[in-house]
Amino acid sequence: MGIKYKVNESFFEKWSPNMAYVLGYIYADGSLNDSPYMRGKYIQITSIDEDSIQRIKGWLNSEHKIIKKKSNFTGGKICFVLRIVSHKIYNDLFKLGLYPNKSLTINFPKVPKKYLGHFIRGYFDGDGCIYFEKSKGKMNQLIIKRIRTIFTSGSKKFLENMSIFLQTKGLRNGKIYYNKRAFQLKYPTSDSIKIFKLIYKGTSINSFFMRKFNIFKDYFELRPQVVDLTIRRILADHVVK
C-alpha cells in the first residue's frame, strides 16, 4: 500500500464558490484517471502557474505533493502537477460530469446559476485567455483597438453549451472557431467586459490567476471611458496591498 495523504474528500459534495472554481479548473486543466495497477482512481490537475495549483491544494486541504516537470503540451515550459488519489473525489467528480479521456467529448455541466461565475472563472484560469488587439497611429503611437476573451476546449459541444449558459447572463452568442487541435469560443470587447464583471464580482484577491485579471485592469486604465461603477468597485476590491 502507498502512503495515504490527507485531503478533504467531501469537497465536491456541496456547491460553494471555491468548489465551483476548482470544478471549472479541472474541466479545463484536469483529468480523471483509473489505473488499477498503479494508483487506482485519482485526479490530476496541471498548470504552468504554481500559485494556482497551491491555491487549489489549499482549498482541498490536501497534503499531496506538487510535482514540477517539463510538459510537451506547454511547449517545454515548466508545469506543476497535483495528483490526488481518492476514490471518493473521483466518484463525486464523475457525478458532476467528468470522466477519463474527456477532452474531445466533455459537455458543459449543470452549474447552479449562483455559482456560474465561479465555475467560469476557474475554467478561464485553466483554459481561457484575454488579449489586446493593438495598432499604431499616424504618429507611431500605440493604440489599443479592443480586447478579446477566448475559451478553449477540445469539445465543441462544451463550448456551445457554455455560450448558451453565458447568454443567460446577458452575453451574445459567442463565435466558435477551430484552431489547430482545439475549438475556441471568442467574445468581443463588450462581452469581455461582461465576463469580467461575472467572474470577478464578489471575489477575494486570492481566488483567481492574478495575471489574467491584470490584463483586464490594464485595459480599463487605457480606456477609462468604459469603466462603470461595478468595474470601479471590482478594481478597488482587488488592489494588492
Regions found by a protein language model. Give the residues of each.
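Internal intein/HINT superfamily modules and their associated LAGLIDADG
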Residues: M1-K241
